[in-house]
Amino acid sequence: MSTNNSVLVLKVGGALLQCEMGMARLMDTAAAMIANGQQVLMVHGGGCLVDEQLAANGMETVKLEGLRVTPPEQMPIIAGALAGTSNKILQGAATKAGIVSVGMSLADGNTVSAKIKDERLGLVGEVSPKDATYLKFILSQGWMPICSSIAMMDDGQMLNVNADQAATVLAKLVGGKLVLLSDVSGVLDGKGQLIPSLTGQQIAELVKQGVIEKGMKVKVEAALEVAQWMGQAVQVASWRDASQLVALAKGEAVGTQIQP
């Protein structure tokens, strides 16, 4: 068994759900790590599925600075696409790889506190760590939590939370190592080349230049926040090469390291 007690928090984007081979490779890698004693927590988005479901219902997708605007009438569809379909697709892939998983959302187990992030965004939530008991129990059994980014306020109102921010908060809660996985190999410079390491100052400069924008801006800023909070680098890497995860579990650098 591995002596690595740190939880590996893997955030996966919606694009993964549309790539069966990518999902299978990622889950096989996660299964091997869990068998070796590594605790793994997966957090997911599902933007592609949400867009499809909204379009099927004649509703428009609007984004503000890389974040999805969530009007009240869209909330049931978004919750269904994320906490329902997306979550179960990933759970199915985990089961196929021999992983015992628990499908959950941010609303479960008193795990986080949630509030409205910005009135302009509608029912978009901002969450903060609350109670790790539920997650720690699941992880202690050798099971893998697969968490969607649907949260709930104290009055029962569902909120849509950006999945990168959700992963950041859960990494804080369990004191884990955060890896933000997308369909790109990391943060790319203006010429499309991978940047191996970035500091907060360099990120601010690249945002100013428009090199880092939209979804990647949200991702990198979430990574920087948790890197600073935990005093350790956060990785932004690709799920397309799941073998990178094994290197990461061994403490090797992959993708772009966001420095605290």
UniProtKB/Swiss-Prot annotation:
It catalyses: N-acetyl-L-glutamate + ATP = N-acetyl-L-glutamyl 5-phosphate + ADP. Its EC number is 2.7.2.8. This is Acetylglutamate kinase. Catalyzes the ATP-dependent phosphorylation of N-acetyl-L-glutamate. Keywords: Amino-acid biosynthesis, Arginine biosynthesis, ATP-binding, Cytoplasm, Kinase, Nucleotide-binding, Transferase. The keyword Nucleotide-binding applies. SUPFAM superfamilies: Carbamate kinase-like. GO terms for cellular component: cytoplasm. GO terms for biological process: arginine biosynthetic process via ornithine; L-arginine biosynthetic process. Substrate binds at G46, G47, R68, N160. It comes from Shewanella sp. (strain MR-7). Its main location: cytoplasm. It is found in: Cytoplasm. GO terms for molecular function: acetylglutamate kinase activity; ATP binding. Pathway: Amino-acid biosynthesis; L-arginine biosynthesis; N(2)-acetyl-L-ornithine from L-glutamate: step 2/4.
